[in-house]
Curated annotation (Swiss-Prot):
Transmembrane segments: none annotated. Binds 2 divalent metal ions per subunit. Its cofactor is a divalent metal cation. It holds the Pfam family Metallophos_2. It is an enzyme of class 3 (hydrolase). This is Probable metallophosphoesterase MTH_1774. It comes from the Archaea. Belongs to the metallophosphoesterase superfamily. YfcE family. Its EC number is 3.1.4.-. Keywords: Hydrolase, Metal-binding. InterPro entries: Calcineurin-like_PHP_lpxH, Metallo-depent_PP-like, MPP_YfcE, PdiEstase_YfcE_CS, Phosphodiesterase_MJ0936/Vps29. A divalent metal cation 2 binds at residues 37, 59, 85, 113.
Length: 172
């Protein structure tokens, strides 16, 4: 199964639209998982033109009255895939995310919130974060594509926009 993973779209509060590169990256997916901070349910309608969408509530979604579950668990082939927004502090703390995944009974946990993509393989769980395609934090805009085939899982971070500035030399 091919799955598109996205988070932290923040449309329309911080960005005006989903980049076309997201639609290109998700062209052949069978399912889209959104890890929260939609800030408008309209994003779901747009993504549903590609594939069915499942989502969870992000911290900003509560401010906009978007009522979706705070966590979900999906049985996809031989994997139990958890979906959360991932509001842990410090942001992206793998130990806290692991505990949340264990509470869900997940062997794969997808989260967002950091606006920074990562793939972490722990002893008993894989932690995935697609980053943000619209408002990345000190990294390139991105989404993720998962391929689950029986007992095999492949995850790929896909850049969806221009790279951010990595260095600057400034002189007066």
């Amino acid at each position: 199964m091919l799955i598109g993973v996205i988070s932290d779209t923040h449309i329309p509060d911080r960005a005006s639209e989903i980049p076309e590169a997201v639609f290109d990256a998700f062209r052949d997916v069978e399912l889209i998982l959104h890890a929260g901070d939609l800030t408008s349910p309209d994003i779901l309608t747009e993504l549903e033109t590609l594939a069915p969408v499942e989502c969870v509530q992000g911290n900003m979604d509560r401010h906009y009255g978007i009522e979706t579950p705070r966590s979900r668990l999906f049985e996809i082939e031989s994997f139990r895939v958890g979906l959360i927004h991932g509001e842990v502090y410090p942001r992206g703390d793998t130990q806290q995310l692991r505990y949340l995944g264990l509470e869900l009974g997940a062997d794969v946990l997808i989260s967002g919130h950091t606006h920074q993509p990562f793939i972490r393989e722990l002893e008993d769980m894989v932690l995935l974060n697609p980053g943000s395609p619209t408002v990345p934090r000190l990294t390139d805009p991105s989404v993720m594509v998962l391929r689950i085939d029986g007992e095999k899982l492949d995850a790929e971070i896909i850049r969806t926009g221009a790279p951010v500035c990595r260095s600057l030399n400034f002189r007066r």
